[in-house]
Amino acid sequence: MLCPGTLFKYAPQFDDLLVKLGKKIGKCQFVFFRQHPKWASILRARLEDSFKKAHLRADDYVVFIPWLNIADFYGLMQKADVFLDTAPFSGFNTAMQAIDCALPIVTKEGQFMRGRLASGILKRIALPELVTQTDDEYISLVARLVQEKNYCDQIRQQIIDSRNILYSDLQPIRTLEEFLINQLR
């Protein structure tokens, strides 16, 4: 499972989600990027503590890899089972890249805009079923995508079939233009 967000976005409450996912799914890996050594060491230490409290070894589940060039990054996204969006600070650029690679995203929608970026993308491409509201929903959905290949493949195909709307719909731009023009009057 790919965790490609900027490391500071992974709040401590996300640690427990990973532990619960590890327990539910069993043998699995959460792949993070070491873009900043200090942030990586802080996150790794936190995850080690969280997994240890659950009588699990973080090293059996958590992997930090070097930052990749764009071709390798897209290659990894195309091979991953699922993209775990950061909570409570959602990803946008990485979520768009995941959509480019037809990688299913699971997000937990936040209260504020910063926690609704990926959910906005998913809703726009008619995949609201990938947007969760609770930890239990998040865990169940991730487990289903990882354990049910047919379901995961169906979601991938839905992404492929609907992702062009994110690039070809000019209505949001026209709405913003209208708003800005009205503000100048």
PLM features: what roles do these ranges have?
Residues 1-69, 78:
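Conserved catalytic-core segment of nucleotide-activated headgroup transferases in glycan assembly
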Residues 5-7, 23, 33-36, 42-50, ...:
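C-terminal amphipathic helix plus adjacent low-complexity
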Residues 71-73, 93-94:
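Short acidic active-site motifs
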